[in-house]
Amino acid sequence: MQEKHIAEIADYIAKHRQKLRLILIAGPSSSGKTSFAQRLRVQLQVMGLRPFSISLDNYFVNREDTPKTPAGAYDYECLEALDVDLFNKDMFALLKGESVVLPRYNFKTGEREWEGQTPLTLEKSQPIIVEGIHGLNEKLTAAIPREYKFKIYVSALTQLNIDAHNRIPTTDARLIRRLVRDYQFRGASALKTLKQWPDVRQGEEKYIFPYQEEADVMFNSAMIYELSALRRYAVPMLEAVTPDVPEYTKARRLLDFCQYFLDLPDEEDVPNNSILREFIGKSVFFKGEDQV
């Protein structure tokens, strides 16, 4: 079903290629939006288009200009952390067929760099794919007429219920995805991820969910078998959370939740282009540190 839906979205974009030039993809944490963007890119190529992907990370303002949270940490999630004016200027120029040198953000120095970057010129009807948490917010692309934009909201809407009265919370399913991914590719313990989760949720409530209605289409990345594939990683991680920390209660609740599922007999049955591979590894779309 997911493959069919991606093909339908790509087909719509291809049929309206003269107008729909800027493809904006957004969604909450661990919704699978990065893998979705890659799969959409491949499908558009199959249809004869040559999509170009642009990372919003390269439009971060210099670190010294980045807003801070009340706690004093750099707030990379707020819209003000991006140079929105420069992003609009570059996107507008590219869509007009002009040559643009795109910035590259150096995370070590905390500064944008242009030196060594090759000028980019897009062909007529060549779409741009942009994936990021602010993709649905009109303020991000205010200079681009709405008719040139196609906005996609990616979420993981769980399709299973525990029983007739208790559904599986979508937020819990995403949290389990994130627990596994952060451990697999960032070496983060379950405790660390659980501690970060309230801040992640706060960012979603502020920067993502208010703009859902802006989307032209919604893509559901949930899979009926995913919790069976994730639990073999999640259970030992959650069992390591000790009773002396506040996050213990949430860990136990997620553990109880995992007990409703059996392990997937053979993980190799998960296709290497599956969105689930973004979390458990061996995705055809990611190589080593690219998955971090």
Q: For each predicted feature, which ranges?
A:
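Post-Walker A helix-loop "phosphate-sensing" segment adjacent to the P-loop in P-loop NTPases
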Residues: V42-F52
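Conserved NTP phosphate-binding and transfer environment spanning the P-loop NTPase/kinase superfamily
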Residues: E3, R17, E138-V292
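Conserved lysine of the Walker
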Residues: K33
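Conserved nucleotide-sensing/catalytic segment adjacent to the nucleotide-binding pocket
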Residues: F52-I54, V61-G110, P127
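Walker A (P-loop) phosphate-binding loop of P-loop NTPases
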Residues: S30
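Extreme N-terminal, non-catalytic leader segments
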Residues: M1-L24, F52
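Glycine-rich phosphate-binding loop used to anchor ATP phosphates in small-molecule kinases
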Residues: N88-E147, L194-Y211
